[in-house]
Amino acid sequence: SRGLGDVYKRQEKGQRLFAYEYNGYWKDVGTLGSYWEANMELIDIIPEFNLYEEFWKIYTKGDIIPPQYIAADAVVDRSIISEGTEVYGEVHNSVIGAGVTIKKGAVIRDSIIMKQSVIGENDVIDKAIIAENVTVGDNVVMGTGEEVPNKLKPNVYSFGLVTVGENTVIPPNVKIGKNTAIVGETTSEDYPGGVL
């Protein structure tokens, strides 16, 4: 990683340092908490890093996918919804990637859901970062309960976030607490008493 610590190490070793004055938006997103905050800032009415400025150009070729579909009885507020996403539930104060499906009865709050993920019926997801190609079963509650430090990596999995790694499968009818990280295909047996 390249951060401020690297600058100090180079200075101590007497290595040459160079500086560049930059007046644009910059935010250190080296932790899950700061990454989550940076995404939530994009939802502000006029974000500091304003993606809607006239001088922003599109330099990458986008996927050829249909526009977003928001069902008639769906609710979306203060959120960014990418192309190809289908919303049948509720999305509040969240950033949703391309090709995501949010099924009927699901409620998403203060979360980041990356592309091609599927959120099941009647799921409640609070303050989560969900990576690409994740499948969440029906009736899952995520980000629930008291904020308890993560047992394995309390300095990494903190900030009250639930973190779900790419290609993860979460079975239906489970509850996932705050500061939890899930990776890989899981089954009901991985959730003692239906809770993690």
Cite the ranges covered by each PLM segment:
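Left-handed beta-helix
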Residues: R2-L196
